[in-house]
Amino acid sequence: MSGGKYVDSEGHLYTVPIREQGNIYKPNNKAMADELSEKQVYDAHTKEIDLVNRDPKHLNDDVVKIDFEDVIAEPEGTHSFDGIWKASFTTFTVTKYWFYRLLSALFGIPMALIWGIYFAILSFLHIWAVVPCIKSFLIEIQCISRVYSIYVHTVCDPLFEAVGKIFSNVRINLQKEI
């Protein structure tokens, strides 16, 4: 920790928590505090974002990386005037650039709010509803699986073994008649 910031193994900077004293991440218990000092706790809300590389995980490499050449192409022998081609390129590129910026300015923050709420609800439901339901189901099904296992071993196994012995002596001979 230097200069009031944490640096993780990937080089990301995190600011020091606002409340140093009484912070829930820094217990007052000396043994726990010493143990915790070996592990740095990061505050995800204060990490700095990269304004140059805005897609570090390459989510949109295959989807929205559209340039003029990807959309408009003139085959050999069918070319417009060079000036028209250059003006079309400039018009396409500038329009795409500024219209994206306009849409981002108008709808970026509301969409971020909507997606933030959506993923918060999704996380909440997963943590507080889905996982407990699955755990409860697994606990309840474990009891049923024991009863089912006893049923299979006491009823089904002898029945199918007997049927198998009955049909084990059945022989079929196929002859081809000419």
From Swiss-Prot:
The gene is CAV1. It comes from Homo sapiens (Human). Residues 82-94 are annotated as: Interaction with CAVIN3. It is linked to Lipodystrophy, congenital generalized, 3: A form of congenital generalized lipodystrophy, a metabolic disorder characterized by a near complete absence of adipose tissue, extreme insulin resistance, hypertriglyceridemia, hepatic steatosis and diabetes mellitus. CGL3 inheritance is autosomal recessive. Belongs to the caveolin family. Its main location: Golgi. Residues 149-160 are annotated as: Interacts with SPRY1, SPRY2, and SPRY4. Skeletal muscle, liver, stomach, lung, kidney and heart (at protein level). Expressed in the brain. The modification N6-acetyllysine is found at K5. GO terms for molecular function: ATPase binding; cholesterol binding; enzyme binding; identical protein binding; inward rectifier potassium channel inhibitor activity; molecular adaptor activity; nitric-oxide synthase binding; nitric-oxide synthase inhibitor activity. Residues 105-125 dip into the membrane without crossing it. The modification Phosphotyrosine is found at Y6, Y14, Y25. InterPro entries: Caveolin, Caveolin_CS. Residues 2-94 are annotated as: Required for homooligomerization. The modification N-acetylserine is found at S2. Residues 2-104, 126-178 are cytoplasmic. Residues 131-142, 167-178 are annotated as: Interacts with SPRY1, SPRY2, SPRY3 and SPRY4. Coiled coil: none annotated. Ubiquitinated. Undergo monoubiquitination and multi- and/or polyubiquitination. Monoubiquitination of N-terminal lysines promotes integration in a ternary complex with UBXN6 and VCP which promotes oligomeric CAV1 targeting to lysosomes for degradation. Ubiquitinated by ZNRF1; leading to degradation and modulation of the TLR4-mediated immune response. The initiator methionine for isoform 2 is removed during or just after translation. The new N-terminal amino acid is then N-acetylated. It holds the Pfam family Caveolin. Keywords: Acetylation, Cell membrane, Congenital generalized lipodystrophy, Diabetes mellitus, Disease variant, Golgi apparatus, Host-virus interaction, Isopeptide bond, Lipoprotein, Membrane, Palmitate, Phosphoprotein, Ubl conjugation. GO terms for cellular component: acrosomal membrane; apical plasma membrane; basolateral plasma membrane; caveola; caveolar macromolecular signaling complex; cell cortex; cilium; cytoplasmic vesicle. This is Caveolin-1.
